């Protein structure tokens, strides 16, 4: 009796387990890496087959981070087939049981196929737009028509990017945070952008453009984030790259000088040597990189006509001949303490020397009488030192990470200006010195935990920043400088922040929800003897949420919806109280009462892909409160114009961006980018306090503008590649005025030599010399038009060799 009862219980249990196992489904996940350098491999083919008869079950490709997920897998014996061009295909057996809903395979390492790599050159071009549609990635080496130039010049050709007045704009907005290797640095500006026109592109591997950052990024930068990724070799053993580029610009005079000034630069030389070394052995990777960019440029050649309601008409020219030498070097090591712990130590040094020789003549309406000649010499040295330490701990589960980092930056700005003021009846001589030492301390703690259908990201960050500045006027004879506006000022910034981000993903849906909380305290101490401004500051505690919802129609079509809230804090130079006299009669001054602007951004994007191309379209809107802009005004009994930053109220930016990429044939492919947007600045009224209080009132401004970029790439015989880039920028509104249309065409060719180790390139920018900047500014009681014929046409030739 008992024996029969026990037999029945066992049979029922077995049947129950069998039934449960048959209905059970499991999610398989893993992380694919390069076996040699441990870097994640995106876009790897992953196929699941049954072990019994090799029947295909399902398949996928790894994402941007090398991760893959296979859902709804029934318990059974299987094997994975992992393949990627240039790597040995790997077969891995796995057993999917019924006791867990989630099977983590951990890390799968792929070995490079040495035989394949020695016989052919592998060229795989990934989509610039990431699978999440929140980021665009561009390799510098693919930008043939701008090879050998600066980072700023390289960005001019990128989809969605425009360059105006030396600053990068994303979708018509220059409020961008620029990172180097994921960190803010003094080289590119904390909270703003600077120095991009002097960083050599030879030092850069790729550029990432993030239009919709998640909460793990700093909240600063309403237009988005640009991350500049420096070169770092990943091959085993000792290897490196050496390069040399030279060029010449300003091939002819586009617009003759006004009478009686020094000649403008012509046939300006450019020289850029570079060296990158790397040694990787077992658990140690050491790297060293040095680049030097020397340029002569006609930095500015602007012709201005000023018209006053109750005064004369003045014609003027601002010509600035510039010599620049920028040296940057980076050294460091990655130490894999064991399989789970890695320590990275690195240091960066940058030295930028700028010599400007400027001439600014002023004439009457018909240029028959010179009213004044302003000449200046600017001698500026910027020195940057940065030290970084980063520790990463990998838990047993793939993708389960703890990152701890510390970053210290020192940046010195040492400027000397010498002025000569020639008037019909007398001559004046003046000078001033400015010294600014910036110190920044950054600490971050980031934690990532994979979940069954996604992951959690959380962390904290602390920044402390101090910038004491001292400006000293050195009075000569017949001085016209505002000596009471000199003295000292000190900027202090403290920003602790905490964030959390949750990412969910299944077969059809993706969702991301994040929140960043920031406390900001800014204090700006001003010399009490300053004639206009007093000490000021502000503090706030604000939430910065972000959200993303995506629907995968199928493997080739996807729709994403984004929202985020961001802030743009005034940078120290925006509130700096000292007048700048590089233009003698349009004088720029900071404003300590300037406050942050806050932005709410919305975006709806769609991407469809096919075998040899893709199409991406996004509709976006930004609403900005407290818009930061520079306002120009005049004061009674003076023709001088003072340009001062102000908060101008609310503004709007709505638009549509499209990117179309297609390989037409084996030898020709295109990338077309179209961006159309509507800009609107509501009516506002502000008070400029310098040099005396005056009120400015502006009516509503709005315009429909945009830009088109067409990149044509040709793969020619004998391993020759060519690129032809056409850029058109439509008229747009700027503070108090408009900027006219601009267009240019760039051309570049390169040839692979020495079995792919060498590369020779030749390019020319703005080959028809058409990139001219025309502006119209309307103020109260005055207006002016300007046309800038600065140097845009440059021819370069260069050679790179990998070893």
What is the role of each PLM region?
Residues 22-24, 88, 102, 119, ...:
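Membrane-proximal, glycine/serine-rich, low-complexity loop/turn segments characteristic
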Residues 51-55, 77-93:
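A short, solvent-exposed loop/turn motif at the edges and junctions
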Residues 51-67:
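Short, acidic Ser/Thr/Gly-rich low-complexity loop/linker segments typical of extracellular
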Residues 253-257, 299-311, 356-370, 414-423, ...:
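Outer-membrane beta-barrel translocator domains and adjoining extracellular loop/strand segments
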Residues 430, 457-556, 686:
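Signature of Gram-negative outer-membrane beta-barrel scaffolds
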Residues 440-444, 485-487, 591, 595, ...:
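Outer membrane beta-barrel strand-and-loop segments of large Gram-negative receptors
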Residues 646-729:
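Gram-negative outer-membrane beta-barrel transporters
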């Amino acid at each position: 009796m008992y024996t029969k009862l026990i037999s029945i219980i066992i049979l029922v249990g077995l049947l129950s387990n069998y039934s449960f196992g048959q209905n059970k489904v499991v999610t398989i996940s893993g992380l694919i890496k390069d076996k040699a350098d441990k870097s994640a491999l995106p876009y790897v083919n992953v196929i699941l087959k049954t072990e019994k008869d090799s029947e295909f079950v399902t398949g996928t490709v790894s994402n941007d981070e090398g991760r893959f997920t296979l859902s709804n897998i029934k318990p059974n014996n299987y094997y994975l087939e992992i393949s990627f061009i240039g790597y040995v295909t790997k077969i891995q057996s796995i057993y999917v049981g019924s006791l867990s809903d989630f099977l983590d395979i951990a890390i799968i390492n792929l070995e490079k196929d040495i035989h394949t790599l020695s016989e052919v050159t592998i060229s795989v071009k990934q989509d610039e737009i990431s699978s999440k549609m929140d980021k665009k990635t561009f390799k510098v080496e693919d930008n043939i028509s701008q090879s050998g130039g600066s980072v700023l010049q390289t960005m001019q050709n990128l989809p969605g990017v425009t360059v105006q007045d030396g600053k990068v704009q994303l979708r018509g907005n220059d409020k961008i945070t620029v990172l180097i290797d994921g960190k803010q640095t003094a080289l590119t500006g904390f909270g703003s952008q600077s120095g991009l026109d002097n960083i050599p592109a030879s030092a850069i591997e790729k550029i990432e453009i993030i239009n919709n950052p998640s909460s793990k990024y700093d909240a600063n930068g309403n237009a988005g984030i640009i991350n500049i990724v420096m070169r770092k070799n990943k091959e085993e053993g000792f290897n490196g790259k050496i390069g040399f580029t030279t060029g010449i610009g300003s091939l002819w005079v586009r617009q003759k000088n006004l009478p009686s000034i020094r000649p403008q630069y012509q046939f300006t030389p450019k020289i850029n040597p570079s060296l990158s070394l790397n040694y990787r052995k077992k658990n140690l990777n050491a790297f060293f990189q040095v680049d030097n960019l020397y340029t002569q440029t006609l930095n500015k050649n602007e012709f201005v006509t000023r018209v006053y309601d109750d005064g004369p008409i003045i014609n003027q020219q601002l010509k600035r001949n510039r010599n620049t030498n920028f040296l940057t070097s980076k050294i460091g090591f990655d130490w894999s303490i064991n399989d789970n712990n890695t320590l990275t130590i690195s240091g960066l040094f940058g030295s930028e020397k700028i010599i400007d020789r400027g001439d600014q003549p002023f004439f009457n309406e018909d240029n028959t009488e010179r009213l004044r000649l302003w000449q200046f010499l600017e001698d500026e040295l910027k020195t940057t030192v940065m030290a970084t330490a980063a520790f990463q701990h990998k838990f047993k589960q793939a993708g389960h990470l703890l990152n701890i980092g510390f970053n210290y930056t020192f940046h010195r700005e040492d400027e000397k200006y010498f002025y000569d003021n020639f008037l019909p009846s007398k001559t004046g001589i003046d000078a001033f010195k400015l010294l600014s030492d910036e110190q920044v301390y950054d600490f971050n703690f980031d934690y990532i935990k994979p979940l069954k259908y996604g992951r959690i990201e959380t962390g904290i960050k602390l920044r402390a920043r101090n910038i004491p500045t001292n400006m000293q006027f050195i009075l000569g004879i017949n001085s016209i400088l505002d000596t009471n506006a000199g003295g000292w000022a000190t900027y202090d910034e403290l920003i602790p922040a905490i964030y959390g981000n949750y990412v969910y993903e299944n077969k059809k849906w993706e969702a991301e929800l994040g929140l960043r909380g920031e406390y900001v305290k800014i204090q700006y101490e001003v010399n009490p003897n300053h004639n206009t401004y007093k000490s000021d500051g502000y503090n706030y505690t604000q939430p910065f949420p972000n959200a993303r919802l995506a629907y995968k129609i199928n493997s080739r079509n996807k729709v994403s919806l984004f929202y985020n809230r961001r802030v743009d804090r005034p940078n120290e130079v925006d509130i700096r109280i000292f007048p700048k006299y590089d233009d003698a009669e349009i004088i720029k001054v900071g404003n300590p009462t300037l406050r942050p602007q806050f932005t709410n951004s919305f975006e709806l994007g769609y991407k469809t892909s096919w075998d040899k191309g893709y199409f991406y379209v996004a509709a976006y809107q930004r609403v900005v409160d407290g818009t930061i802009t520079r306002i120009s005004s005049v004061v009674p009994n003076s023709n001088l114009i003072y340009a001062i930053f102000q908060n101008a109220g609310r503004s709007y930016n709505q638009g549509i961006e499209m990117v179309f990429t297609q390989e037409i044939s084996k030898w020709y492919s295109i990338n077309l980018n179209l961006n159309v947007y509507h800009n609107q600045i509501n009516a506002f009224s502000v008070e400029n306090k310098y040099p005396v209080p005056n009120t400015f009132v502006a009516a509503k401004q709005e315009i429909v503008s945009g830009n088109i970029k067409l990149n044509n790439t040709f793969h020619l015989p004998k391993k020759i590649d060519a690129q032809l880039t056409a850029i058109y920028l439509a008229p747009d509104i700027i503070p108090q005025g408009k900027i006219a249309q601009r267009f240019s065409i760039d051309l570049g060719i390169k040839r692979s030599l020495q079995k792919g180790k060498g590369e020779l390139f030749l390019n020319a920018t703005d080959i028809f010399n058409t990139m001219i900047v025309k502006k119209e500014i309307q103020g109260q009681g005055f207006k002016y038009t300007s046309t800038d014929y600065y140097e845009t046409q440059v021819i370069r030739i260069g050679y790179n060799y990998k070893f």
